[in-house]
């Protein structure tokens, strides 16, 4: 204990709890594997594509691929061969 220790701002328990919660949330997100928005993104892409092309529900695939330091969003759309209109 130094002479000037009383001048330092002490961390509150709320700050400590907030920091711990942020660490826990970051760990949970990294263990889950993918972001929460991928299924929603896949549904919305399917809806937009269906406005212009008649495709199946399974025709749109959305995956998150980790490539070293980068995350790559891989979107694959299987289009029909004929000129179908919805």
Curated annotation (Swiss-Prot):
Pfam families: MinE. It comes from Stenotrophomonas maltophilia (strain K279a). GO terms for biological process: cell division; regulation of division septum assembly. Prevents the cell division inhibition by proteins MinC and MinD at internal division sites while permitting inhibition at polar sites. This ensures cell division at the proper site by restricting the formation of a division septum at the midpoint of the long axis of the cell. InterPro entries: MinE, MinE_sf. SUPFAM superfamilies: Cell division protein MinE topological specificity domain. The keyword Cell cycle applies. It comes from the Bacteria. Keywords: Cell cycle, Cell division. Belongs to the MinE family. NCBIfam families: minE, PRK00296.1. This is Cell division topological specificity factor. The keyword GTP-binding does not apply.
């Amino acid at each position: 204990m130094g002479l000037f220790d009383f001048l330092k701002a002490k961390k509150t328990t709320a700050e400590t709890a907030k920091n711990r919660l942020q660490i826990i949330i970051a760990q949970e997100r990294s263990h889950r594997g993918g972001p929460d928005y991928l299924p929603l993104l896949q549904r919305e892409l399917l809806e937009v594509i269906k406005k212009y092309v008649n495709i199946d529900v399974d025709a749109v695939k959305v995956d998150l691929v980790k490539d070293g330091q980068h995350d790559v969003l891989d979107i694959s759309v299987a289009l029909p061969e004929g000129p179908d209109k919805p």
